[in-house]
């Protein structure tokens, strides 16, 4: 990725890059190589979506770098596989042990962008997947409220890592 102020500068840099690549006997993939005006459109690169929106006091748009939709779908699919019903023989502790390395790696890679909103979404998704597994094991409705109480307590002390709450203690109110 090469960042330039004007389209003319970008085209000059692109031509210079082509010359360097031909000297090295390498080629650029025309489908993946393009010049983009970030004020008008966004683009994905290495799992991040680069986009400008919002405004400063001067009226300029701010650049943002967040996990792409494809990356979000991929991590949700991985979470879904770990927490699926087919692995019902596993306890929640085993699921947490499998989820923690996934969460830690994903968080460490994407923490350098503007990922707060996406991290919160993923924390809610993990909670919902684990809660759903516990909730639907109880068929009788009168027990479900008690199960929720116990699950909140368990989740708060389970040792599961969070996407958003990095190196922070998270307090969960138990009702």
What residues fall within each predicted segment?
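Non-catalytic terminal/accessory segments
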Residues: 1-175
């Amino acid at each position: 990725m090469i960042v330039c102020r004007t389209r003319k500068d970008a085209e000059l840099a692109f031509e210079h890059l082509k010359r360097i690549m031909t000297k090295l006997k390498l080629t650029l993939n025309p489908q993946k190589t393009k010049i983009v005006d970030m004020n008008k459109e966004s683009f994905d690169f290495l799992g991040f979506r680069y986009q400008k929106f919002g405004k400063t006091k001067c009226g300029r748009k701010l650049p943002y770098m967040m996990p792409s939709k494809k990356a979000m779908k991929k991590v949700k699919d991985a979470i879904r596989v770990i927490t699926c019903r087919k692995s019902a023989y596993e306890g929640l502790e085993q699921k947490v042990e499998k989820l923690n390395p996934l969460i830690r790696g994903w968080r460490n890679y994407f923490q350098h962008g503007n990922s707060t909103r996406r991290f919160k979404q993923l924390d809610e998704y993990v909670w919902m997947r684990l809660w759903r597994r516990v909730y639907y094991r109880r068929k009788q409705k009168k027990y479900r409220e008690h199960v929720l109480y116990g699950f909140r307590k368990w989740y708060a002390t389970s040792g599961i890592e969070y996407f958003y709450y990095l190196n922070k203690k998270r307090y969960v109110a138990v009702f």
